[in-house]
Amino acid sequence: MKKKAIVSVISVICVIAVAVGIFAGCSSKKSDSNTSNSAQKGAITVISREEGSGTRDAFTELMGIMDDSGNDATAQSAEITNSTSVMMSTVQGNKNAIGYVSLGSLSDSVKALKLDGAEASVETIKNGSYKLQRPFNIAYIDGSLSKEAQDFIKFITSKEGEAIITKEGYIGIDATESYTASKMSGTVTLAGSTSVAPVMNVLADEYKKLNPGMKIEIQESGSSAGIESAMQGAVNIAMSSRELKNNEAAKLKSQKIALDGIAVIVNKENKL
């Protein structure tokens, strides 16, 4: 747990409360009437991801938002969104909102806050000054991958794959081998993180240009759901924006494909 980062986020929330003249804690009401009243009074609206989201799991762990038993202690009254895109649009549409998203998905529709004076960027993640960072992983049943799935993974972890990952705003692995098109035909199925999905879609598109006979099916279901699907053999590959838990790692092999930051975001009208 990074204590300085925790203090920074708490300070950010307190500054927002002071700016609007009301200290409302870190929660909001879900009902339309209460949400409306909160907006009029300037209360903070905390936006969180759903249970099972890898981004939520990583955020709560890194920020120490856990109870004494180590369980997620996200406020029950926080508004829940089920994807990165919904989180962005929700914060964009509510000038009192505060939330968090994958750095690679960050756009100018919202504003990212500094933590400990460091902006969320590829450079600050690389040098370690921005503490909210987590891995992007793929996971699969070792020894059970189809040749097609193995070939797609070979592309993802190649120099060509790393270049795509870097271009999309993430930090790639240190790939050592180049990819040679296999010209295979078949289907590879993936499921999981809505944070990993955008870069995975770009990787899939570039891979299919090299291998026109291949079909890559990507389902955005959340990290935990994707991992469960892979464990059950329902998909070839899981996408996860968190590390695998012990029970998951006992059944699946995981590979890091990138490093990503988590940006704390507010509405662009916010003065911070």
Language model segments and positions:
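Sec-dependent bacterial lipoprotein signal peptides
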Residues: 1-24
